[in-house]
Curated annotation (Swiss-Prot):
<feature type="binding site">
    <location>
        <begin position="34"/>
        <end position="36"/>
    </location>
    <ligand>
        <name>S-adenosyl-L-methionine</name>
    </ligand>
</feature>
<keyword id="KW-0489">Methyltransferase</keyword>
<dbReference type="InterPro" id="IPR029063">
    <property type="entry name" value="SAM-dependent_MTases_sf"/>
</dbReference>
<comment type="similarity">
    <text>Belongs to the methyltransferase superfamily. RsmH family.</text>
</comment>
<dbReference type="GO" id="GO:0071424">
    <property type="term" value="F:rRNA (cytosine-N4-)-methyltransferase activity"/>
</dbReference>
<keyword id="KW-0698">rRNA processing</keyword>
<keyword id="KW-0949">S-adenosyl-L-methionine</keyword>
<feature type="binding site">
    <location>
        <position position="54"/>
    </location>
    <ligand>
        <name>S-adenosyl-L-methionine</name>
    </ligand>
</feature>
<comment type="function">
    <text>Specifically methylates the N4 position of cytidine in position 1402 (C1402) of 16S rRNA.</text>
</comment>
<dbReference type="InterPro" id="IPR023397">
    <property type="entry name" value="SAM-dep_MeTrfase_MraW_recog"/>
</dbReference>
<protein>
    <recommendedName>
        <fullName>Ribosomal RNA small subunit methyltransferase H</fullName>
        <ecNumber>2.1.1.199</ecNumber>
    </recommendedName>
</protein>
<dbReference type="GO" id="GO:0005737">
    <property type="term" value="C:cytoplasm"/>
</dbReference>
<keyword id="KW-0963">Cytoplasm</keyword>
<feature type="binding site">
    <location>
        <position position="101"/>
    </location>
    <ligand>
        <name>S-adenosyl-L-methionine</name>
    </ligand>
</feature>
<feature type="binding site">
    <location>
        <position position="80"/>
    </location>
    <ligand>
        <name>S-adenosyl-L-methionine</name>
    </ligand>
</feature>
<dbReference type="InterPro" id="IPR002903">
    <property type="entry name" value="RsmH"/>
</dbReference>
<feature type="binding site">
    <location>
        <position position="108"/>
    </location>
    <ligand>
        <name>S-adenosyl-L-methionine</name>
    </ligand>
</feature>
Length: 308
């Protein structure tokens, strides 16, 4: 079954931030189902170029079908940690805009075979790139107690990580934990009772932590962001949509490092303009978007521009 319905978060706000030049070169680093790419392409002339990157084969198949007759579009299957090298391979050395949408696409969440959702029963998987070996099943069934505690604490910021890690180790000693709902049940059974009455799902942060570990998500962000910024043309923009505090902290740290004044304090700043500037503190979904698309609720958009 195909799962291709997806509502792109902060779509218009992101495109406005990019200030798309008709003859510019733009890179969608997380193609998904192409919401950003399609709107960028509408603003490009025949001299413009769009590069679509994704590590998910279903997304790549969708992109190839969508843009099969368009010579202005290049589709590349890779993780964006390889951003600079794959662009260099295509003789692209300078870019006018990059988009990173760090959220899971609806097709990934809604396809039960991918194992991302804690609402649907599926084999534990959670791989963005389905050709890689490490998956959620291996982590849940083979990581030591200490490693489970580490990822739950580091990637989920969970205070009772030891309790759940202990429950997982205990349960898997008698029977392998094979499916998402088996894991959800263990999390519920071993969670503090007050957690079960909170508005957010008790398994949410555990699934987030496992997914981040499976895909090495946070470790590659800083490199990819720095690579993108290093390739910007003057007035080029990097726009990034994050979905949880761990991602947003990395975005802020990288952007602020470029945007801060690096001149010694004793040097007068008359008419001085830093090479990079923040385009905004943060942009969040409108009330209308929140009403229309519940999955946008945690999204934050930030942008950085290269002034010269």
């Amino acid at each position: 079954m195909e799962f291709n319905q997806h509502t792109t978060v902060l779509l218009n706000e992101t495109i406005e931030l990019l200030h798309v030049k008709p003859d510019g070169i733009y890179v969608d680093c997380t193609f998904g189902r192409g919401g950003h790419s399609q709107l960028i392409l509408k603003k490009l002339s025949k001299k413009g170029k769009l590069i679509c990157i994704d590590q998910d084969q279903q997304a790549i198949d969708f992109a190839n079908n969508l843009f099969k007759d368009n010579p202005n579009v290049i589709v590349i299957k890779t993780n964006f940690k390889n951003l600079k090298s794959v662009l260099y391979d295509h003789q692209i050395f300078h870019v006018d805009g990059f988009v990173f949408d760090l959220g899971l696409s609806s097709p990934q969440l809604d396809d039960p075979e991918r194992g991302f959702s804690y609402h649907k029963d599926a084999l534990l998987d959670m791989r963005m790139d389905q050709e890689q070996k490490l998956n959620a099943h291996y982590i849940v069934n083979h990581y030591s107690f200490a490693k489970l505690v580490n990822i739950f604490t580091k990637y989920g910021e969970i205070k009772y990580a030891k309790t759940i890690a202990n429950g997982i180790v205990k349960e898997r000693s008698t029977k392998a934990i094979n499916t998402t709902l088996e894991l959800v049940e263990i999390i519920k059974n071993y969670s503090p009772k007050k957690i079960l009455f909170e508005k957010k799902h008790p398994a949410r942060l555990f699934f987030q932590a496992i997914r981040i570990e499976v895909n090495d998500e946070l470790n590659i962000l800083k490199k990819a962001f720095n690579d993108a910024i290093s390739m910007l043309n003057p007035l080029g923009v990097v726009a990034i949509i994050s979905f949880h505090s761990l991602e947003d902290k990395i975005v802020k740290k990288v952007f602020n490092n470029y945007a801060k004044n690096k001149l010694p304090k004793e040097i007068p700043l008359n008419n001085y303009v830093n090479q990079y500037s923040l385009l905004n503190q943060k942009i969040m979904p409108s009330t209308q978007e929140l009403n229309d698309n519940n999955r946008s609720r945690s999204s934050i958009l930030r942008g950085l521009v290269k002034n010269y």
